[in-house]
Amino acid sequence: MRSGVIAQKVGMTRVFTETGEHIPVTVLKLGNCQVVGHRTTEKNGYVALQLGSGSRKTVYMPKAERGQFAVAKVEPKRKLAEFRVSEDSLIPVGAEIQADHFVVGQFVDVTGTSVGKGFAGGMKRWNFGGLRATHGVSISHRSIGSTGGRQDPGKTWKNKKMPGHMGVDRITTLNLRVVQTDVERGLILVEGAVPGSKGGWISVRDAVKKPLPKEAPKPGKFKVAGEQAAEAPAMQEGA
């Protein structure tokens, strides 16, 4: 199981195929996505990579957090996230993951925070039908109607769909196809829409419900400080 990456949503555009077909894509940018730390079974009880992306001024950081980045010898990051990996997919601390960590044609799962809509009624939030336009209904055409029974159960059940705050939820979209990658600019183009607003932080990982292509680099495609980008050595059979 490979690591994912932290990216920022740039926006949407479209690309054209050789046959003239246009594909709507979302542009995701890798902003110096580096490995900040390891989580091991001996010390933490599980195996994972802690990644960081973006940049942050140290003046606004707690001293303990500054020390964490100093030990890893990486510049302070604005966004941190952990990705569960297998033991043979650990990437060295300080390595920068490249855009060609994902190959064209493979499927990925993306996770982000949806756009906030504020307070919304039942018709907008839950797609309720509302009340009738006439026949005695006045003022409350867009209300949700009854919310519970009479004597039995005599209450409104928990988790009843009602008006309330809409958006700002953690949303995962499954099986988006990678259309194109740009290593020099750190861009990943995925087909379709990605949750969140422009500039929002997005987690991208290999699709859980789709097979990983054979040409996908293992444990990943990364660049160590002071070296050119190179694919990590593959694990030998039976190792």
UniProtKB/Swiss-Prot annotation:
UniProt cross-references to Pfam families, sorted A to Z: Ribosomal_L3 (PF00297)
GO cellular component, one term: cytosolic large ribosomal subunit
Keywords: Methylation, Ribonucleoprotein, Ribosomal protein, RNA-binding, rRNA-binding
Superkingdom of source: Bacteria
Region described as Disordered: 140-164, 211-239
InterPro entries with a match to the protein in the record: Ribosomal_uL3 (IPR000597), Ribosomal_uL3_bac/org-type (IPR019927), Ribosomal_uL3_CS (IPR019926), Transl_B-barrel_sf (IPR009000)
MF term (GO), any: structural constituent of ribosome
GO biological processes: translation
Residue numbers of N5-methylglutamine PTMs: 151
Family of the protein in this entry: Belongs to the universal ribosomal protein uL3 family.
Function, in words: One of the primary rRNA binding proteins, it binds directly near the 3'-end of the 23S rRNA, where it nucleates assembly of the 50S subunit.
Protein name (database record): Large ribosomal subunit protein uL3
Native source species: Bradyrhizobium sp. (strain ORS 278)
Gene: rplC
